[in-house]
Amino acid sequence: MKLTTNYNDNNYDIFVEYNVLNKDYDFNYYDKRIALIDESVYRLHQQKIDLFLNKHSIFKLLIPGGEQVKTMHHYSTVVEKLLSMHVTRHSCLFAIGGGATGDFTGFVAATLLRGIHFIQVPTTILAHDASIGGKTGINASSGKNLIGAFKRPDMVLYDLDFLETLSQIEKLSGFAEIIKHVLLNANGHISKSETVLEIMHDVKDEVCLSELHAIDKWITFGIQTKMKVVHDDEFESGVRKFLNFGHTFGHAIEFHHKLPHGIAVMHGMIYALLLSDVTESDIMSLMRWMHRLGLKKLVYDNFDIYYELMRQDKKNEANEINFVLYYENNGYKVEQVDVKRLRKAFERLRKLEGELL
């Protein structure tokens, strides 16, 4: 399927289908073409990737996989390497890997020579979210994505063949962001929302997720949701903040427990719903489904640990912790939440986790 962004200008195409890398593209506009490739992805898909690179005369540069590449050290190393290759502002980088590879490559493209071209080639489910919207960045010692820029890709080539080699944890982590996009489309009681019921029917359990049931349908849905939100608010001054649903507590969980991003966000979404006006029965229904998909119970530490991490979140304002919350009659809103309310929701979360079979 071909989707096209609907900004006022500088739009780009997003291709989502199996075997998309084998289609014909014209990259001759770019004087140099360099792919920054997650080395783990390259090992798993070397033949497929090499065919694409050779067909389009793209030089390959292997980089570490995952969040470990998003450091100032790797940034400066890659930038110096690219400068030694005499790239120009008409050159193009190809990000072949997951969301972290896209974040990193996009940030390099945004800052090198004050901006060169780049194309996203996502290889994970999670990257469906990161490949849309133009957010790029690397991490600082004190938190994720604290150094970054907005940079739109020229194109997104989403080849679903890459998803076949994902581990079950990677599939679940990526599917979490799709769940987020589904919940962002909810209205009224979550348990009665048509889209929520539909995804629960399509992907009932861990086996369905493992076999990637209807994955093209739900990745496309996630991309369309993200595109609509980003079109309305590209630079995160309003409704785009809703895309941070589940991320405030989720980032604290991710940082402290060293969990995959999406897994942490699943816990974060449940916590955010507990801060909202959603009924416990609706929340338990959602939790049970997430656990059928493979989400494991988390042994939480002291609340104060998570509270201090949440205080460092870059979405906060005036030292107040901001959360994206859901109200059944009014939809989503960004709200400052005080420590007493946060602590109470945390204790409820622990209680509900204990009640799960």
Curated annotation (Swiss-Prot):
Predominant localisation class: cytoplasm
GO molecular function: 3-dehydroquinate synthase activity; metal ion binding; nucleotide binding
Co-factor remark: Binds 1 divalent metal cation per subunit. Can use either Co(2+) or Zn(2+).
Keyword Glycosyltransferase listed: no
One of the GO biological process terms: chorismate biosynthetic process
Enzyme class, first EC level, given as a word: lyase
Keyword terms, alphabetized: Amino-acid biosynthesis, Aromatic amino acid biosynthesis, Cobalt, Cytoplasm, Lyase, Metal-binding, NAD, Nucleotide-binding, Zinc
EC number: 4.2.3.4
Catalytic activity: 7-phospho-2-dehydro-3-deoxy-D-arabino-heptonate = 3-dehydroquinate + phosphate
UniProt: NAD(+) binding residues: G99, A100, T101, G102, D103, T123, T124, K135, K144, F162, L163, E164, T165
The keyword Oxidoreductase belongs to this UniProt entry's keyword annotation: no
Pathway participation: Metabolic intermediate biosynthesis; chorismate biosynthesis; chorismate from D-erythrose 4-phosphate and phosphoenolpyruvate: step 2/7
Cofactors demanded by this protein: Co(2+); Zn(2+); NAD(+)
GO CC terms in record: cytoplasm
Pfam family, one: DHQS_C
Origin: domain of life: Bacteria
Cell location: Cytoplasm
Positions annotated to bind Zn(2+): E177, H247, H261
Gene3D superfamilies xrefs: 3.40.50.1970, Dehydroquinate synthase-like - alpha domain
NCBIfam families: aroB
PANTHER family assigned: 3-DEHYDROQUINATE SYNTHASE (PTHR43622), 3-DEHYDROQUINATE SYNTHASE, CHLOROPLASTIC (PTHR43622:SF7)
Family that this chain belongs to: Belongs to the sugar phosphate cyclases superfamily. Dehydroquinate synthase family.
Function: Catalyzes the conversion of 3-deoxy-D-arabino-heptulosonate 7-phosphate (DAHP) to dehydroquinate (DHQ).
Protein name listed in UniProt: 3-dehydroquinate synthase
